[in-house]
C-alpha cells in the first residue's frame, strides 16, 4: 500500500471491514466540470460542442434583418486572460472575470439581384460581448471582492407527467387525472379531466377548453379524432334487427340483453345472464362470426364515421351522433347496410373523447385556432395571420419553444418510443400520444408518475444556469440588432456598431450578484465551504417556494439512496428543500443524479463499477454494501438484504445484479464525518451534520482521535491545504513560502523547474474567521505530487480538524450541567485550546464632496495627541497597534458648509489664517464592543492622485516580496544549469580561457570551483559540439533572466497604476483587526452527534473531578442528555477515544524508556493489524517508525467509517491493549475498562459510582457570546415613533413589550411603569429634561406625552375622525 509523505507521519487505524473498491470522487467535481463545459475555454474553436456559451450563440445567431437583406452570423468566441488574479480581485473589491469577445460576420445581400441570394459584401470583426466571471480552482466565484457560490438547483425535469388529484378536488372523492407537458422553455400544456369525464386542455394555466379544439387545430377531423381513440363495432342492418361482428374480448363480463344464439339458432347465452369465459369458448367453438341483435340494441350507440347517402351525397348522420329511431329510419330509407359505432363500456373503454366532442362547438381547423387565439389574447381581433402566427409560435417555433435534449428523451421514454432523440419542438403525434396515455389512465390502465422520484427531477448546475442567463442577455441584444440591421448598408455600419454588450453584461451581473442561487459563500471552516458547493436547492427561479412546498416534496424518497443525503438538510422552513449531494453521487449528461454500483455476475461481485440513474436502478436487484463476501468474491449468505424498485427484501444471491460500492454511499460529506453515525437518531445526526459546519477554527487545530477516515479527503479537496503540484525536494521553507526544486522527470522542457507556494497568512474569511496556512515540511524533504505541504485553517497534518479532543466525564456537577449546559475546566482556557482568531475588516473612503475633497490626514483639530498616538504621518494606524473601542484607526476630515462666524473668530482667522472650523472629524474608529490588533492595512488611491507615504511603502513591500520569489526561481534555475554545465565541462579539452588556461589542458573540478560561475562561459573548448552546448546554456540563462525582469516590470506596472474605485471616491483605506476570542460562559459548543450546549461555568482545575492518578476532567457533561435523544454514538466515541489516548500514553511511555525500535514495531503492528483494515508497517524504515511513534504519543487516531465501524469486541480489545491490568487497577476501572473512579476536586472524596470517562472531539461553534452581548445607555431613535431602535447592529435597546408591562402592572410598580413608557422610551421632551435634571443634581422626572400617542392621533385623523386632547 502506498502512503503519501504526510500519511506516513500519522496513520489512522481503520476499523473498516471492507476494502476500498471505488475511491471517493473529487468532491468539487460537479461545480468545476459544469462550469468548464459552459466556457469550453481550453477547447479549440473547431472542436467545441454545442453546449454552454457555444450553444447560446448558435441558438440566437444568425440574426436576419426584417427585410432579409442583411444578416449577422456568429463565427467563434474567445476569452481573454483576467486582468487581476484572484487575490488582487479580493483586495480591490473587483470581480474575477474574463472579457468575452465574439468573432461575428456581417453579410449584406444585393437588393438588386432577382434571386435574393447574391452576397454583396462581408465584414468580419471581433466584438466585445461583456465580462464572464471565472470560477476559482476551488469552485467559487469572486464577485465584487467577495467569494460567492452558485448552488445547484433541483427542478422538475422537462418532459410529460401524468398525475391525479388524489380525490381532493371533487366531493365524491373521484380521481381526476391530468397530464402536463413541461418544456425547458416555452408554454406549458396541461390536459385534465373534469368530474363529468370531459377532457380539457389549458395553455400556461389559462382558462380550460375542450381538448378536441386542440386536436381540430392541429388538423384532425372529428372522424380522425374518433378513429385515434376508439375501436369500432361493425353492424350490418337487416330487415329486422341487425348482425353484429363477433369480437370475443368485447363481450366478456357484459350482461346479455337478449338470447345469444349460434348459427343453427341454438341458444348459448340466455337473456339477463352475465357472459363468462365458458360462453365465449362455446361461441368460438361454434365458429360464430356474427351475432344477431335486436334493433333496440343499436339505439344509444354512437356513430364512428359520417354516414353519406351514396346516391345524393347528402350527409345522413355525422360522426359522433347518437343512433336514434329517426336515424335508423333514415339509414334504411337510404338503403345503407354497413355502419360502424364506437365500442365503449363502463369498465375499461370510456366514451371520454366522444363526450368531449359534444361539448366542443368549433366546426373546423380555422374555428379551433381562432378559439385558442381568443383564449390566449382576449379582446384582440383575430386576423388570419395573427391566429396562424400565434398558434405556430406556441409549440412549433424553435425560438419560443424548446423541449431540450432531456425533455425529448423523457417524453419519448414516457410515451413508450424506442428512440430518445427527436425534434426539440412539440409535434402533432406528441400531443396525440399524451392524450392517448391520459385516456388509458382514466380507463384504469397504467400508472401515474411520482413527481418526487429523482428520475423526474434533474439538477441544473452552475454552467446551465449561467448559460440560461447569457442566452436571455443575447436575446435582448438580438432585438436591438434586428432593428439596426436594416440600416447596416446605408450607414456603412460595422458589426461592433450593431452589437451593444450592455444587456449581456447586466444579465450576467444580475445573476452572479443577486440571484437567489448565487449565495455568499459559507467559509467558517473547510467543511462548510465544501458542503456549500455540494448543496442542491429546490428553491430559486423556476423552482418551488417555501410556502407552497408540501410534505411530499420535502420527504426522503427511496430514489435518494446514494444520490441525495437523507440526513443533511437545514432545520426550519427549508427542511427537505435544501439537500446535500451524497458522497459518490455524480451527474449524467442529462443532469440526472447517478450513483455507482459494483456489478454482480453469477453471485460473484466484480470490480466493474456502473453508474446508474434513479430510473435505471429500479430495474435491478441491488445488494447492500455490508453483504458478506468470500475470498473469491462470491456472496456467502443464503439470503442477502437487497433493494428492488425502492423496496427492501431478503433474496438469494443468484438474483443479485448489483451491489453498493461503500456503506457510506448514502450519506453526504458532513454526515460521513460523524463516527458511529449508525448508533445515532437521524434527527440528532442532522443537527450534528449542520453544527460541524459552524465549528470555528481553533488556534491550534487538533485531529479528531476518533474519525471516520474521510477527514483527509475533505481537507485536501476543499483546497484549504497546499498540495504539491509536482514532486521534488523542498529547497526552502519559512512561515510564508515553500520553494520546491522539481524532479527532473516531472519538469517540462523550457519551463522553470521550480514551484513556489506563497502561503495565505492571517486572511479574513467571509465569516470573519481566520484563514492561515502553516508549512508541515522541512528543508530537504522529498515530496511527490499531491502531497500536503501546508495545513490550512482547521486542518492538522492534512486532515480535517474542526475541534479539540477533550477528556469528558458524564456526570452531574452541582446543577451546572442542567439542560445541556457544559462545565469546562479552566485549564482548557489557559492552554488556549478553544481560542480562535477572528479578523474584522474596517473601511473608510475619502470622497469628493460638493464642498471639497475629504482628506485622510493625521492633522485633526480637537483630538488629543494620545488619540493620534497610533497613527503614522499619513494618518493611518500602524500595523501591530493594539486598539480598543473608540480608538482612531484612520484620521479623516470632511469639509463642512460655511457657518456664521463670531467677530472673535473673524479676528483669529485674520491673524492666524485659522481654518480648522471648516472641517469636521469623520475618522474611522473602532466600533463599540471590539478590540484587537491591527494586522494589515491596504490603501487604494484613484489614478491621478498623489500617493501618500504609507501607500508607497505598501507597494514597495509587495514588490520586494515578488522580487524574492523571482530571485529564488532564478537561483534554482541557474544552479541547475551550472550543475549541468560542470558535468559537461569536466574532462573536456580547452583551447584557452580565463586565469591563463593553457591550450590543450583538460578542465577539472578544482579549476571550475576557483572560477566565478559566469566566467565558465569564457572557456574556449576544443570540441565544437560542446562549445555549441555551452553557448546554448548561456543563452537560456540570459533568456530566463530577461523573462524574470519582464515579469517584475509587469507586476510593478500593475501595482503602480491607479486603482479602480467607485465614482466619487478618491482614496480607500482598509484596516484589518485580529480579535482573539477565548472560550467563556455563554459560548455554544457541540459534539458531532447533535449534542449541543452552552458553557455555563469555567471551573478552576483544582475543583474539577479527577482520577486516581490526579488527571482532572476537561469537560463535564450531563448524562441525561443521552438516553432521551438517542444519540448513543457519543458514548461509543468517548469509549474509543479513551482507548486511543491510552494507546498513545503507552507509546509515549515506551519512547520515554527508549525502547528498542523492534519492540515499538511489534506494539504498533498489534494496534494496527489485529483487526479492521491492515496497514503495511513492514515497508517503514526504522526512522519512519520512530517518527510515526512520536506523532502517536497524543493518541492513536482511529477511523470508524459510517455503517462499517468498530464493533464492541474491537473496542474492548483496544481498551485492554491501552490499559493493562496494573493501570486499570491503579485507576480503579470497571472490568470493561470504560468507567473510572473519580474524586471530587473540592473535597477529595471519591464519587459513589464509577463514571464514564473518555475523549470526545468537541467543537466551539460560531455563536459566540461576544457577538451577541450588547448594552445601551442612550443611542439612536426611530424616526417616526421616536422609540429606541432594536438590535445590536443598530446599537438598539431592549424592547419592553406588552407582557412586560403586565408584569409591572401585577407588581403595582406604577412609577417604574411610567418611566418605562415615557422618558425611557419615546417622550422626547421628557428624556432631555431628565438629562438636564441629572446634570443639575435634581433627581425628578417630568413625564410628558409619548410620541407614539401622537402617531396614533395622526393615524386616526387620517381615517377622517377628528380627535383632540382635552388638557387639564
UniProtKB/Swiss-Prot annotation:
Matching HAMAP family: RNApol_bact_RpoB
**What does UniProt give as GO cellular component?**
DNA-directed RNA polymerase complex
Reaction(s) catalyzed by this protein? RNA(n) + a ribonucleoside 5'-triphosphate = RNA(n+1) + diphosphate
The family assignment reads: Belongs to the RNA polymerase beta chain family.
The UniProt keywords, alphabetically, are: DNA-directed RNA polymerase, Nucleotidyltransferase, Transcription, Transferase
Q: What is the lineage of its organism?
A: Bacteria, Pseudomonadati, Pseudomonadota, Betaproteobacteria, Burkholderiales
Purpose: DNA-dependent RNA polymerase catalyzes the transcription of DNA into RNA using the four ribonucleoside triphosphates as substrates.
Q: What is its EC number?
A: 2.7.7.6
Example of a GO MF term? DNA binding
Which processes are annotated in GO (biological process)?
DNA-templated transcription
The protein here is known as DNA-directed RNA polymerase subunit beta
Matches recorded under Pfam families: RNA_pol_Rpb2_1, RNA_pol_Rpb2_2, RNA_pol_Rpb2_3, RNA_pol_Rpb2_45, RNA_pol_Rpb2_6, RNA_pol_Rpb2_7
Quaternary arrangement and interactors, per the entry? The RNAP catalytic core consists of 2 alpha, 1 beta, 1 beta' and 1 omega subunit. When a sigma factor is associated with the core the holoenzyme is formed, which can initiate transcription.
Amino acid at each position: 500500500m502506498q502512503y503519501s509523505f504526510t500519511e506516513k507521519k500519522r496513520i489512522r487505524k481503520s476499523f473498516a471491514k471492507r476494502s476500498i473498491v471505488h475511491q471517493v470522487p473529487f468532491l468539487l467535481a460537479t461545480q468545476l466540470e459544469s462550469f468548464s463545459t459552459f466556457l469550453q475555454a481550453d477547447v479549440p474553436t473547431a472542436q467545441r460542442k454545442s453546449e454552454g456559451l457555444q450553444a447560446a450563440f448558435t441558438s440566437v445567431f444568425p440574426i436576419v434583418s426584417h427585410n432579409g437583406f442583411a444578416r449577422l452570423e456568429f463565427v467563434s468566441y474567445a476569452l481573454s486572460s483576467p486582468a487581476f488574479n484572484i487575490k488582487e480581485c479580493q483586495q480591490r473589491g473587483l470581480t474575477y472575470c474574463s472579457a468575452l469577445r465574439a468573432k461575428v460576420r456581417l453579410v449584406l445581400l444585393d437588393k438588386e439581384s432577382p434571386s435574393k441570394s447574391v452576397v454583396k459584401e462581408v465584414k468580419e470583426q471581433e466584438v466585445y460581448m461583456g465580462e464572464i466571471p471565472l470560477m476559482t480552482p476551488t469552485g467559487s466565484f469572486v464577485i465584487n471582492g467577495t467569494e460567492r457560490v452558485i448552488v445547484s438547483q433541483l427542478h422538475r425535469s422537462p418532459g410529460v407527467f401524468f398525475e391525479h388529484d388524489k380525490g381532493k378536488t371533487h366531493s365524491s372523492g373521484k380521481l381526476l387525472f391530468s397530464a402536463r407537458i413541461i418544456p425547458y422553455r416555452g408554454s406549458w400544456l396541461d390536459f385534465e379531466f373534469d368530474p363529468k369525464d370531459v377532457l380539457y386542455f389549458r395553455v400556461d394555466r389559462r382558462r380550460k377548453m375542450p381538448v378536441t379544439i386542440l386536436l381540430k387545430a392541429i388538423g384532425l377531423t372529428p372522424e380522425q379524432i374518433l378513429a385515434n381513440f376508439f375501436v369500432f363495432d361493425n353492424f350490418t342492418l337487416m330487415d329486422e334487427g341487425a348482425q353484429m361482428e363477433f369480437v370475443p374480448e368485447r363481450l366478456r363480463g357484459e350482461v346479455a340483453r337478449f338470447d345469444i344464439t349460434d348459427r343453427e339458432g341454438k341458444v348459448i347465452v340466455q337473456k339477463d345472464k352475465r357472459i363468462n369465459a365458458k360462453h365465449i369458448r362455446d361461441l368460438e367453438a361454434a365458429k360464430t362470426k356474427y351475432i344477431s341483435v335486436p334493433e333496440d340494441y343499436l339505439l344509444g350507440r354512437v356513430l364512428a364515421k359520417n354516414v353519406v347517402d351514396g346516391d345524393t351525397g347528402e350527409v345522413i348522420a355525422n360522426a359522433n351522433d347518437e343512433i336514434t329511431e329517426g336515424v335508423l329510419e333514415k339509414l334504411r330509407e337510404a338503403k345503407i347496410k354497413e355502419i360502424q359505432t364506437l365500442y365503449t363500456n363502463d369498465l375499461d373503454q370510456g366514451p371520454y373523447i366522444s363526450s368531449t366532442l359534444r361539448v366542443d362547438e368549433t366546426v373546423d381547423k380555422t374555428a379551433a385556432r381562432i378559439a385558442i387565439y381568443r383564449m390566449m389574447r382576449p379582446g384582440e381581433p383575430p386576423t388570419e395571420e395573427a391566429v396562424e402566427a400565434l398558434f405556430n409560435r406556441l409549440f412549433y417555433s424553435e425560438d419560443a419553444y424548446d423541449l431540450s435534449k432531456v425533455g425529448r428523451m423523457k417524453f419519448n421514454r414516457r410515451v413508450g418510443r424506442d428512440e430518445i432523440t427527436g425534434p426539440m419542438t412539440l409535434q402533432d403525434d406528441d400531443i396525440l400520444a399524451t392524450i392517448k396515455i391520459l385516456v388509458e389512465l382514466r380507463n384504469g390502465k397504467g400508472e401515474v408518475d411520482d413527481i418526487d422520484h429523482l428520475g423526474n427531477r434533474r439538477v441544473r448546475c452552475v454552467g446551465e444556469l449561467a448559460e440560461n442567463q447569457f442566452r436571455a442577455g443575447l436575446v435582448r441584444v438580438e432585438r436591438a440588432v434586428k432593428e439596426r440591421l436594416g440600416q447596416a448598408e446605408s450607414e456603412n455600419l460595422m458589426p461592433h456598431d450593431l452589437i451593444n454588450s450592455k444587456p449581456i453584461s447586466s444579465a450576467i451581473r444580475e445573476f452572479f450578484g443577486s440571484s437567489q442561487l448565487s449565495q455568499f459563500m459559507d467559509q467558517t471552516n473547510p467543511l462548510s465551504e465544501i458542503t456549500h458547493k455540494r448543496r442542491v436547492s429546490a428553491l430559486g427561479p423556476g423552482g418551488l417556494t417555501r410556502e407552497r412546498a408540501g410534505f411530499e416534496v420535502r420527504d426522503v424518497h427511496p430514489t435518494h439512496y446514494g444520490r441525495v443525503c437523507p440526513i443533511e438538510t437545514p432545520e426550519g422552513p427549508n427542511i427537505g428543500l435544501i439537500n446535500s449531494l451524497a458522497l459518490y453521487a455524480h451527474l449524467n449528461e442529462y443532469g440526472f443524479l447517478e450513483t455507482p454500483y459494483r456489478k454482480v455476475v453469477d453471485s460473484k461481485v466484480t470490480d466493474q463499477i456502473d453508474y446508474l440513474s434513479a430510473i435505471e436502478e429500479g430495474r435491478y436487484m441491488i445488494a447492500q454494501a455490508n453483504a458478506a463476501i468470500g475470498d473469491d468474491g462470491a456472496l456467502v449468505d443464503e439470503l442477502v438484504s437487497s433493494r428492488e424498485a425502492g423496496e427492501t427484501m431478503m433474496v438469494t444471491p443468484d438474483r443479485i445484479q448489483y451491489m453498493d460500492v461503500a456503506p457510506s454511499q448514502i450519506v453526504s460529506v458532513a454526515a460521513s464525518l460523524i463516527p458511529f453515525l449508525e448508533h445515532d437518531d437521524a434527527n440528532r445526526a442532522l443537527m450534528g451534520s449542520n453544527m460541524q459546519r459552524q465549528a470555528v477554527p481553533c488556534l491550534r487545530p487538533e485531529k479528531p482521535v476518533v474519525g471516520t477516515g474521510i477527514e483527509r479527503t475533505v481537507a485536501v479537496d476543499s483546497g484549504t491545504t497546499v498540495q504539491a503540484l509536482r514532486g521534488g525536494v523542498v529547497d526552502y521553507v519559512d512561515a510564508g513560502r515553500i520553494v520546491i526544486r522539481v524532479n527532473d522527470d516531472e519538469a517540462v522542457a523550457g519551463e522553470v523547474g521550480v514551484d513556489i507556494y506563497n502561503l495565505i497568512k492571517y486572511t479574513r474569511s467571509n465569516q470573519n474567521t481566520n484563514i492561515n496556512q502553516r508549512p508541515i515540511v522541512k528543508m530537504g524533504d522529498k515530496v511527490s505530487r499531491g502531497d500536503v505541504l501546508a495545513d490550512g485553517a482547521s486542518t492538522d497534518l492534512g486532515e480535517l480538524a474542526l475541534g479539540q479532543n477533550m477528556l469528558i466525564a458524564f456526570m452531574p456537577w452541582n446543577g451546572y450541567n442542567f439542560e445541556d449546559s457544559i462545565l469546562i475546566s479552566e485549564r482548557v482556557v489557559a492552554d488556549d485550546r478553544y481560542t480562535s482568531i477572528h479578523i474584522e475588516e474596517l473601511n473608510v473612503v475619502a470622497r469628493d464632496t460638493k464642498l471639497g475633497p475629504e482628506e485622510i490626514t493625521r492633522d485633526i483639530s480637537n483630538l488629543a495627541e494620545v488619540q493620534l498616538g497610533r497613527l503614522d504621518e499619513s494618518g493611518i494606524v500602524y500595523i501591530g497597534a493594539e486598539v480598543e473601542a473608540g480608538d482612531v484607526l484612520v484620521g479623516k476630515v470632511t469639509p463642512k458648509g460655511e457657518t456664521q462666524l463670531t467677530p472673535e473668530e473673524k479676528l483669529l482667522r485674520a491673524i492666524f489664517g485659522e481654518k480648522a472650523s471648516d472641517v469636521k472629524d469623520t475618522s474611522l474608529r473602532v466600533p463599540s464592543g471590539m478590540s484587537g490588533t491591527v494586522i494589515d492595512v491596504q490603501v487604494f488611491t484613484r489614478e491621478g492622485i498623489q500617493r501618500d507615504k504609507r501607500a508607497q511603502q505598501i507597494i514597495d513591500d509587495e514588490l520586494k516580496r515578488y522580487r524574492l520569489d523571482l530571485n529564488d526561481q532564478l537561483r534554482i534555475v541557474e544552479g541547475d544549469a551550472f550543475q549541468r554545465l560542470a558535468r559537461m565541462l569536466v574532462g573536456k579539452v580547452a583551447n584557452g580561457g580565463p586565469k591563463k588556461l593553457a591550450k590543450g589542458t583538460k578542465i577539472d573540478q578544482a579549476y571550475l570551483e576557483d572560477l566565478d560561475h559566469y566566467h565558465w562561459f569564457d572557456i574556449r573548448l576544443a570540441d565544437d559540439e560542446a562549445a555549441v552546448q555551452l553557448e546554448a546554456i548561456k543563452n537560456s540563462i540570459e533568456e530566463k533572466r530577461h523573462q524574470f525582469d519582464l515579469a517584475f516590470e509587469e507586476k510593478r506596472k500593475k501595482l503602480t497604476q491607479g486603482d479602480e474605485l467607485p465614482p466619487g471616491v478618491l482614496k480607500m483605506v482598509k484596516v484589518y483587526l485580529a480579535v482573539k476570542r477565548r472560550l467563556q460562559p455563554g459560548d455554544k459548543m457541540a459534539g458531532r452527534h447533535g449534542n449541543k450546549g452552552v458553557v455555563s461555568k469555567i471551573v478552576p482545575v483544582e475543583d474539577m473531578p479527577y482520577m486516581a492518578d490526579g488527571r482532572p476532567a476537561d469537560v463535564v457533561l450531563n448524562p441525561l442528555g443521552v438516553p432521551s435523544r438517542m444519540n448513543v454514538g457519543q458514548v461509543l466515541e468517548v469509549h474509543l477515544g479513551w482507548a486511543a489516548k491510552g494507546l498513545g500514553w503507552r507509546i509515549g511511555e515506551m519512547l520515554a524508556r527508549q525502547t528498542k525500535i523492534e519492540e515499538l514495531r511489534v506494539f504498533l503492528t498489534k494496534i494496527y493489524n489485529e483487526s479492521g483494515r491492515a496497514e503495511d508497517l513492514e515497508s517503514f524504515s526504522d526512522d519512519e517508525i520512530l517518527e510515526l511513534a512520536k506523532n502517536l504519543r497524543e493518541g492513536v487516531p482511529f477511523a470508524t467509517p459510517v455503517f462499517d465501524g468498530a464493533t464492541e469486541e474491537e473496542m474492548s480489545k483496544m481498551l485492554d491493549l491501552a490499559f493493562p491490568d496494573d493501570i486499570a487497577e491503579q485507576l480503579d476501572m470497571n472490568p470493561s475498562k470504560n468507567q473510572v473512579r473519580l474524586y471530587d476536586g473540592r473535597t477529595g472524596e471519591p464519587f459513589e459510582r464509577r463514571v464514564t470517562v473518555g475523549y470526545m472531539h468537541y467543537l466551539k461553534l460560531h455563536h459566540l457570546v461576544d457577538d451577541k452581548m450588547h448594552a445601551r445607555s442612550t443611542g439612536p431613535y426611530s424616526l417616526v415613533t421616536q422609540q429606541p431602535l432594536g438590535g445590536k447592529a443598530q446599537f438598539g435597546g431592549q424592547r419592553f413589550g406588552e407582557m412586560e408591562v403586565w408584569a409591572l402592572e401585577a407588581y403595582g410598580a406604577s412609577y417604574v411603569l411610567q418611566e418605562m413608557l415615557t422618558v425611557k422610551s419615546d417622550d422626547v421632551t421628557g428624556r432631555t429634561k431628565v438629562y438636564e435634571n441629572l446634570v443639575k443634581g435634581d433627581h425628578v422626572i417630568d413625564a410628558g406625552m409619548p410620541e407614539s400617542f401622537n402617531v396614533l392621533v395622526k393615524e386616526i385623523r387620517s381615517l377622517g375622525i377628528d380627535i383632540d386632547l382635552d388638557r387639564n
